């Protein structure tokens, strides 16, 4: 028989959005966007950070009430907000996100998971906290929040509770971070790797119990039967699951730099954005998320 080669049927793409609002706040923006690509054949999960300052073209959109909205250019972080205000619903926020990711990068999102700050804190505490390796600069930054988070951290491995973990994944101004989002998103992937590594070591019954406690805290674009189906696919993989980080999307090709100054709306106001080579990024992401050809190694680069 022919050896099995991973095809699009083996891939599940889950978009995780950390939504920047607390209970009672009306504004909705995507503070964090991570694509989790599950390869059920190779038993891998690959994490890709979506850079929030990327300048994207979002499509004309029909919301869940049937009303039509015109597309345009905007930073990726604002796509969630633009979709949300159509009907004040997560469904339209994630719907516009999914359409934008497909039209700009060729990413086909299968499922969406949205979590806000308060739910993130609760979920991490339910998991019993996460152990994360901190640099001296990161520890110093977090210790500025000492009165708020009640305990100090140090350089090296530290246990983070939900509140401190939230400060860690949102950190942007630690010494050496610079102006870009690269180090911040790298921290978020490191945190997700540590979280998944902890879940890997849990018994199947404990994972199921954890899922039952966490799912009510988040918004998901799945029916109960789809959630059950996904768990049935994922649980047998856990013990041998390999967790990978692919870096960011977009990946910067030569000739593109961070912090391009662009008049997005033609109103004379200049905004710092991330520009990218669309064709090269689509080819890269299709290979990474759908198994279409070999993943290019020399075209997209991380500076």
Give residue ranges: language-model regions.
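Non-catalytic, solvent-exposed segments at the cell envelope interface
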Residues: 1-303
